[in-house]
Every structure is written in C-alpha cells, then in structure tokens.
Design a protein with these regions (language model features):
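Short, small/polar residue-rich loop motifs at catalytic or cofactor-binding pockets
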Residues: 73-74, 289, 442-443, 466, ...
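Short active-site neighborhood of thiol/selenol oxidoreductases, capturing the structured segment around
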Residues: 458-487, 503-504
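Thiol-/selenol-based redox modules, centered on thioredoxin-like
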Residues: 423-428, 558-613
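Structural microenvironment flanking redox-active thiols in thiol-disulfide oxidoreductases
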Residues: 482-546
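Short, acidic, Ser/Thr-enriched surface-loop or helix-capping motifs
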Residues: 81, 139, 451-452, 573-574
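N-terminal "domain-start" segment that seeds a small globular fold
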Residues: 423-460, 485
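Extended, low-polarity transmembrane helix blocks
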Residues: 2-140, 144-432
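Structural micro-motif
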Residues: 532-533, 544, 548-557, 564-571
C-alpha cells in the first residue's frame, strides 16, 4: 500500500515549530527561575548582612576538592549541558524513537527490543513534552554539577547523573548494545551514558572517601579490567575484526565505518572516515592488532595502579581515543540525530580522573586539623537550627545556581510526568506523518450506499451529526485495520458526545463489494458492537462514483492473492453536510502511539464542530 511505512516526517514544519515554541517558552521560564532566585538571594543578603558575613568567614573548606573530582564534575557537567543542547535539535522530538532508539535496538535480543520499544512508544505519545524534558533535565544536571563543588548538593548532583544516565543507557542506548552482536569498544561499548553514570557515582561519594588511597586504586583497577576485557573481545576470532575484507565484502570494522560515512555530515569528516575505511579494508589485520595491543597495554598499566606507568600510557590512550572518535565514531554527534559525542570523550575524562586519583592521593596526615576535629552535623541538627532567611543569606552563589538547576530539571520533568498520566497521544504525532491536513468549507459530495447490515444510508440521512469518514479495504491486513481501530478509539474518546458523531467507512475494494465481507471485517476488528460505526458498500458503479466525487484515485488492482493497493484518506463533515477537514492519512510505523495520536486528532476535530474546545 503506497502510504505504509513512509514513516514519520521529522521535518514537518508544524511539528518543528511546535517543538521550538515549547523550548522557547520553557527557556524563558528557566531564565525567570534563575532571575527570581538571584533576586531573592541578593535581597535577603542585604537584609541579613551578619549572616552573609558569617558565610564569608567560613568559605575556606576543611578539605579542598581533589583534582580527579574536579575533572569529573566539570568535564561531565559540560558534557551534560552539551548533550541537552543536542537534544534541542528541531527533528529530535518526533525523530528520536524512530531514527535513533528503535534502530539501535533492532539487532538486540527480542526482550531488549520490547523494553526499548515500550519506551519509544511512551515517548511518542507526547513527543513535545518528552523532547523538552530531555533537554532541560540534561542541561539542569550539567549546570548542577558545574555549580555545586562540594557538600550535599554536589553529591546529589552526582546521584542525579547516575539516575538519568542509567535511564538513557537502558532506554536510549539499548543497554549500550552489550547484548547485540558486533559489540566493540571502537564503537562505544558499553555505552557512553554508562560512563556518565560511573562518573556520577564517584562524584556522589562522601568527602571522607576522597581521603582514602583505595579510591584511586579501585578506580584504576576497574578501568584496567574493562580495557583488558575489551581487548580480549576485540581479539576474539570469528567476530570479523581481523580481516579488512572477507569474501569480497568489507570486514566488521570497515563495514561499520563505511555505513557511518554515508550519514549526513560535513564533507571533510566523511572523506576522513572513507579514507580510514579504505585503509582498514587493505590492512585490517594490522589495524586490529594495534587496537588490541593498545587496549591490553593500557589495561595492564591501569591495573598496576602505578602513576609512573599510567601517566605515559594515558597520553597514548588519549591519542587512540581521539583517533577513534574522529575516524570511527564520526565525532558521535555530527551524523544524523546525534544525541551525544559518543564514548571516547567521557572515556578520556574517566581515565584522566583515575590517573589523578592515584597520582595525587591525599595522605591522612595532610588532613587539616579543622577537618580532623570537626564534629559531623546531621540533617536533623541542621533542620532544627535552620532559619530560612538567614540560611538563604549565608548561602553561596553556587548553592543558588544549584537550586536554579534543580528548578530547571523540574521544569522539564513535570510536564512530561503529567502528560504520561494521559492514555491519549498528543495529536502533534499525527501531524508528523507524511500527508496533509487542510481546513476547508464546502458541501461534502453526496453518497447513497448500503451499510454492513443491509440498510440504506446516505449523507443526507446523517445530517445533524458530525461525520468522520474514511475509505477501507475489507481484505486489507496492514493500514486499514489500524485506521479502523483509530476510528474505534476516537468513538471511545468522545464519550457521551459519541451519540452525535457517526464513524463512517466506505468500501475501497472493487473486488469484494458484498455485505458479507464488511461484516467479516467488523467482526475481525471488534467493530460489530460499536453503535455509531457504519461500513458502507454498493455496486461497483456506485463506489467508483463516490471515489471520484471525493477525488480519490481508483484502487490499483494487483495480482490475485494480494491486497488492493490504495492510499489512505479521512474527512471531517459537519452537521450541515459541509466538508470541514481533509486528512492525508498515513499510519506511518503503525505504533500504538501513532494510532492513539490519530484517534485524538479525529476526536478533537469532532469536538470542535460540536462546540467543545
């Protein structure tokens, strides 16, 4: 059928404009949040100068933030902000499930696909809210990490990075592809956002852990084990990484990079990736040998835990990561709908932090006396003596910025949480499907046909009710059942208004025009008991006349045993028999979210004619 699987039009101007408008509105609210918090902070500090002075005298920390933690906090803070900005791409709202999430899951086991597709469907129910939520949550986490250098707020920022990172890793990266064939460090295994989560867990550690020499050793040991494991996986025979070509076809790595080079991106980058692909096809064994050896050496150095070994190896490892990032991962975000820079940048940050943790491990003797003698103050004690105005006055600018970042996260998450409570998809998804929606106002073409029960039905007999009209092939097993269910769901969504709306389908199959075929279709699709459902047929001459009046091309007769090839259409007719809306109806990928979105659009159109907003 011509319309089937043409899919979602991610560049649809209506959808793009709606997403941009949502981001602009929420962006203004985000700025207002920071402005109000800043104004409140300045005002209270002026009102309570003593509290502000006390804060100024106590700004020297008992224990300075170690360099390894600064690298993680600042580095991943910048990455989260950058990722949030990437999520603001106009095509991202409706394109992420179909062009990013589902393709990644396609090669994974069925249970992974079910988990990921469930998330994609839920995203698609409310794509504007989901797209905006992902922008502000990630920007908020990034600002939070950058602003909160120490204390409970800083540790909570680390936990937020862990939580959101795991959500993205599971549902957005399909568990980083660890269950899919072809798993390789070269293409980002075990998932970039899992590294974000690991970094967040390290940031969330209490300050007493900073002073432990074991922290650096455990971190470098973990990195070492991972790299050695990836080296073994890369060297494993039969996975296709050793030969540059096999039986005249590109090897595993060359095949991957060749595909990456075809994605939309700057010409110079595509040329570099193509050049590497050609080189790998000619020297695949040597390329894989270098990669395996480099991973093994780097892993062994990190496992040793010795800064003198890790330092020089880290420099070489960083060079390898940059080369991989450019020539194999394609910079991660320049091809297609990129959502992050991929794994090499966060990998270098984590490895650098691990090196700094063992190179500059603080000795217990160097701990300041104030830190040694300080009595920990618990949450109960803090709440007991808390004085809100003075607490605000004594707060630093970093704390205020952290509070603003938390507000930004809530700003993104709250609308999505509210939207998810609705079982009905946003009508914007229907508008993103290839097709058109035109507002019109002219007398609808007349028809006089027979319904599924053999009764005569004409457009005149339906006057006084809103008519939602479509054309269905009673033997179709692809689009038509989906459209029928959309009409059925629209009837359910109308509730008590359904009594004033007729759901009408006209037969679009020139070969099967008997009433018995219509009845069989109704039973199959659960429409037999729907009181306002009318499925109409007639003689071939009558049907051809109706098709012509509604400017619908005649269905294409295909070989016996196949479905009738046809387009998908829907019309909205008001109570006076005037055509008010024409829908180019394409069911796209046929997901539950798509169906619900079309049902919601039909429901809205009917309610507008009934006088409801």
């Amino acid at each position: 059928m011509p319309g089937m699987n043409s899919g979602i039009n991610v560049s649809n101007p209506i959808v793009v404009a709606a997403f941009k408008a949502a981001l602009v509105h929420q962006g203004l609210i985000a700025l207002l949040i920071f402005a109000l918090l800043g104004l409140a902070w300045v005002t209270v500090r002026i009102s309570f100068p003593a509290a502000a002075a006390t804060r100024a005298q106590a700004t020297a920390p008992a224990l300075a933030e170690p360099a390894w933690r600064q690298v993680l906090r600042i580095g991943f803070g910048v990455l989260w902000v950058f990722d949030g900005i990437l999520q603001a791409q106009p095509k991202m709202a409706v394109g992420l499930p179909s062009q990013v999430i589902e393709p990644i899951a396609a090669s994974s086991p069925r249970w992974v696909q079910q988990v990921v597709n469930w998330a994609g469907t839920n995203w698609s129910y409310h794509p504007m809210q989901a797209g905006a939520a992902s922008v502000w949550i990630q920007v908020g986490i990034g600002i939070w990490l950058l602003a909160a250098a120490r204390g409970p707020l800083s540790r909570l920022a680390g936990l937020a990075s862990v939580g959101w990172g795991l959500v993205v890793w599971v549902f957005g990266e399909s568990f980083g592809g660890i269950f899919a064939p072809g798993l390789t460090w070269l293409f980002g295994a075990p998932g970039a956002v899992l590294i974000y989560a690991v970094a967040g867990a390290l940031i969330a550690l209490p300050e007493r852990a900073w002073r432990s020499p074991w922290l650096g050793r455990l971190t470098t040991a973990g990195i070492g084990l991972f790299l050695v494991g990836m080296a073994v996986l890369q060297a494993w025979p039969g996975r296709g990484f050793w030969p540059g070509t096999a039986l005249g076809q590109p090897g595993t790595l060359a095949g991957m990079t060749g595909t990456m080079a075809q994605t939309p991106q700057p010409g110079f980058l595509s040329a570099w990736v193509n050049a590497f692909t050609t080189f790998d096809e000619a020297h695949g064994f040597a390329v894989n040998l270098v990669v395996v050896a480099a991973l093994a050496v780097a892993g062994a150095a990190f496992l040793s835990g010795r800064p003198r070994l890790i330092g020089p190896v880290l420099a070489g490892f960083a060079v390898l990561c940059v080369a991989d990032w450019v020539l194999i991962e394609d910079l991660g975000f320049l091809g297609g709908l990129g959502t992050d820079p991929n794994s090499m940048v966060p990998m270098v940050l984590l490895a650098t932090a691990g090196y700094l943790a063992v190179a500059r491990a603080p000795a217990a003797a160097a701990e300041p006396a104030a830190a040694q003698s300080a009595t920990p103050v618990g949450w109960r004690e803090r709440l007991r003596v808390a004085d809100a105005p003075r607490a605000v006055a004594s707060a630093g600018i970093r704390s205020v910025a952290s509070a603003g970042a938390i507000g930004v996260i809530i700003l993104g998450a709250a609308p999505m949480a509210v939207a998810q409570a609705s079982p009905v998809a946003d009508t914007i998804l229907a508008q993103s499907i290839n097709g058109s929606s035109n507002q019109v106002n002219f007398p609808a073409p007349a028809f006089s046909l027979t319904d599924q029960d053999g009764r005569a039905v004409s457009l005149v007999s339906l006057r006084g009710n809103v008519v939602l009209l479509t054309f269905l092939d009673d033997t179709c097993s692809v689009d038509c059942p989906l459209i029928a269910q959309e009409f059925r769901q629209a009837g359910q969504l109308l509730g008590t208004d359904a009594a004033r709306v007729d759901l009408v389908a006209i037969n679009y199959n020139p070969l099967d025009i008997q009433v018995s075929y219509l009845q069989a279709f109704d039973r199959q699709e659960g429409l037999a008991g729907v009181p306002n459902w009318l499925y109409l047929t007639g003689t071939l001459a009558q049907l051809e006349q109706v098709w012509s009046r509604y400017s619908i091309p005649p269905p294409e007769i295909v070989p016996a045993g196949s479905m009738i090839a046809h387009g998908d259409y829907a019309f909205v007719i008001d109570q006076a028999g005037h055509m008010r809306q024409e829908l180019g109806f394409d069911t796209g990928p046929g997901t539950q979210a798509t169906k619900s979105s079309f049902a919601a659009e039909l429901t809205d159109a009917a309610r507008q004619l009934l006088g409801h907003s």
